């Protein structure tokens, strides 16, 4: 690409970047979906996590350095010199220099040309020969050296993608572009990080895909937070990849390569709503960039990158923004950042400075902070299997002593995922998921969601030996209901008010904002309750349970009655002729009847009983338009909740078509959120 083309591409990218309003900061620190059960697990839970959750054995740590070069000889000399002068502590380190192929300007303008007549007099090939002569003669004393001169021009996307395939779980790749300069301490530092966070089981987490030497330069999501790390240690985790010296871990990189090949074979694009990477795809540089693909993959898998928190003028790697390069001035993020941002006056850390700033101190992983693409802190691993663990989680999610609890038991994984993406779009992130013990639910905790596992162990703790006499054929469903009720009871005893909803109840609006401040003033209109109404609405939509002594008393009596009823075949006299006989629906009807019989106000609020009010509307899946053509004349904006009852008995394609037509389908073909939202 000539200088004129490069500047046009940079200008276009910068204009799009500024117009979209994304938060760029130089770092200063103080389709058709296959929804079968096996595909759900495969798509939602990364294979490396489901196959192994333990650290690799520290047998033979090995690093291969991959230098990506094209047409900048002076840059390459500076980069290789800094690598050669680094301290490797006597380790054997491989060096691979990957030189992209030079092509004539004319052939770049004519992609139909398959055979090119090369002329030694052209500046392009002349520069290539000069670079090749230099790298051939470059002395590397720390291990084997290999030079790869591409037979075809790959550009930065191809150079990065095809740079490495790990030979084993102990091989790590350190990839640098030719305009990066390294500190003498970079290898010792990376080895220390890998030793601490890859080989020590207590610090190992399969969600970590690598280590970046640079200070993060960009929050790629619209409306993202400033790049401010509120941590005392030297390290933090951030989802964004950094390419001013990036160490890659073997397992996540293999996953990425396989995923990338699959996407390219299907002619897919790395679209992710709310991200600056979408604007890059529309620029002259878009097809040459690999970062949009990797960002999409990281979002899909929920992976993170280790970063180093240094002083504003210190660095383990420096990017020099040299003109030229393989695709217009380097590969990190896009050229506009390099050309327009005011880079700090960085200096490479010396040995003495490393001692003064405690560079070698590695905190336990549990003390390190995690940040997503919005640079919003993520609380990973919030999973409760006991009442004590539940108490700790509630303190992290409560808002004004109120907790939103979401029952996801027996709800299909893709329905739960769609609900989560919808909540993100509404700005709701503080809630607790109640789930059965399956890999998908546990993986949600790894991704930062608060999860309570309704397991046999928890049922024993909450219900004691009383549950042992329940008919085994009914035990699972009824036990999950009883544990749910007991979890709510535990939350009430801890002093919190409760909103209780279901993951198969789609919220069209933020109902906490609409009704949150009104619930304590609302009273149940007994005359307006029709006991023959659709019973699902009493537990699948939205319940509000205030905190009072009377409520706790009623809740305990409800569980006790159902334990007794579950042990016998006698019908519950309170349910009478109501059109429900057993299961969780009966629980909520029982509670409703008990509250109506009581003379005291037990603090029970059920939004479904207020359907007579025009400002509340709950509909079912069949009420949604069947396709987009019908949807043009239909609106769900006046609806508050869409109940997805009976999804398991319907064709997934029909459900998806209806939700999509109503604007309620928020996940893509890989069951990942289509859009990233950074609302507070």
Predicted regions located by residue number:
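Catalytic core and acceptor-binding pocket of nucleotide-sugar-dependent glycosyltransferases
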Residues: 239-335, 520, 535, 542-680
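Active-site-proximal specificity loops/subdomain of glycosyltransferases
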Residues: 101-171, 436-494
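A conserved hydrophobic helix/loop-capping motif in glycosyltransferases and polysaccharide synthases
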Residues: 63-72, 404-409
């Amino acid at each position: 690409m000539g200088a004129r083309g490069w500047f046009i591409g940079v200008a276009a990218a910068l204009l799009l970047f500024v117009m979209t309003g994304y938060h760029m900061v130089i770092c200063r620190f103080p389709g058709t979906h296959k929804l079968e059960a096996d595909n759900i697990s495969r798509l939602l839970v990364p294979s490396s996590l489901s196959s192994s959750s333990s650290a690799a054995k520290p047998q033979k740590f090995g690093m291969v350095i991959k230098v990506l070069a094209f047409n900048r000889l002076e840059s390459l000399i500076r980069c290789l010199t800094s690598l050669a002068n680094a301290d490797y502590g006597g380790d054997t380190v491989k060096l691979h220099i990957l030189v992209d192929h030079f092509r004539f300007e004319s052939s770049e303008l004519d992609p139909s040309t398959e055979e090119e007549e090369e002329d030694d007099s052209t500046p392009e090939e002349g520069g290539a020969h000069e670079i090749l002569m230099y790298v051939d003669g470059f002395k590397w004393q720390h291990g084997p050296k290999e030079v790869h001169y591409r037979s075809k021009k790959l550009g930065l996307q191809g150079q990065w993608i095809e740079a490495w395939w790990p030979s084993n779980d102990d091989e790590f790749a350190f990839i640098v572009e030719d305009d990066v300069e390294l500190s003498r301490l970079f290898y010792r530092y990376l080895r220390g990080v890998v030793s601490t966070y890859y080989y020590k089981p207590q610090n190992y987490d399969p969600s970590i895909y690598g280590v970046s030497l640079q200070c993060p330069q960009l929050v790629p999501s619209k409306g993202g937070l400033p790049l401010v790390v509120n941590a005392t240690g030297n390290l933090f985790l951030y989802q964004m990849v950094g390419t001013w010296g990036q160490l890659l871990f073997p397992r996540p990189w293999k996953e990425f390569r396989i995923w990338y090949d699959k996407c390219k074979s299907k002619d897919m694009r790395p679209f992710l709503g709310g991200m600056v990477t979408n604007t890059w795809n529309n620029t002259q540089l878009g097809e040459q960039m690999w970062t949009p693909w990797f960002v999409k993959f990281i979002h899909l898998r929920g992976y993170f990158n280790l970063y180093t928190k240094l002083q504003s003028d210190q660095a383990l790697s420096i990017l020099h923004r040299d003109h030229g390069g393989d695709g217009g001035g380097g590969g990190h993020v896009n050229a506009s950042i390099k050309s327009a941002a005011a880079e700090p006056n960085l200096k490479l850390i010396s040995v003495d400075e490393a001692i003064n700033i405690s560079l070698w101190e590695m905190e336990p992983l549990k003390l390190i902070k995690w940040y997503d693409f919005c640079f919003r802190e993520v609380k990973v691993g919030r999973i409760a299997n006991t009442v004590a663990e539940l108490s700790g989680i509630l303190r992290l999610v409560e808002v004004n002593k109120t907790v939103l609890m979401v029952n996801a038991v027996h709800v299909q994984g893709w329905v739960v995922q769609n609900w989560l993406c919808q909540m993100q779009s509404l700005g709701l992130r503080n809630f607790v998921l109640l789930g059965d013990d399956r890999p998908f639910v546990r993986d949600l905790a790894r991704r930062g969601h608060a999860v309570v596992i309704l397991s046999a162990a928890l049922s024993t703790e909450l219900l004691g030996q009383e549950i042992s006499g329940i008919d085994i054929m009914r035990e699972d469903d009824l036990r999950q209901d009883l544990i749910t009720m007991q979890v709510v009871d535990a939350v009430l005893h801890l002093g919190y008010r409760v909103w209780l909803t279901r993951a198969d109840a789609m919220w069209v609006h933020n109902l906490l904002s609409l009704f949150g401040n009104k619930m304590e003033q609302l009273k149940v209109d007994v005359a307006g309750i029709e006991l023959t109404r659709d019973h699902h609405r009493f537990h699948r939509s939205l319940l509000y349970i205030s905190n009072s002594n009377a409520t706790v008393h009623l809740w305990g009596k409800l569980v006790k009655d159902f334990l007794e009823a579950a042990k016998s075949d006698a019908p519950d006299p309170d349910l009478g002729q109501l059109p429900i006989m057993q299961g969780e629906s009966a629980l909520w009807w029982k509670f409703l009847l008990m509250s109506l019989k009581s003379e005291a106000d037990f603090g029970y609020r059920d939004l479904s009983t207020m359907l007579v009010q025009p400002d509340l509307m709950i509909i079912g899946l069949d009420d949604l338009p069947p396709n987009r053509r019908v949807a043009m004349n239909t609106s769900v904006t006046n609806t508050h909740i869409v109940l997805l009852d009976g999804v398991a008995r319907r064709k997934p394609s029909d459900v998806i078509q209806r939700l999509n037509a109503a604007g309620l389908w928020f996940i893509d073909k890989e069951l990942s959120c289509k859009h990233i939202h950074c609302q507070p």
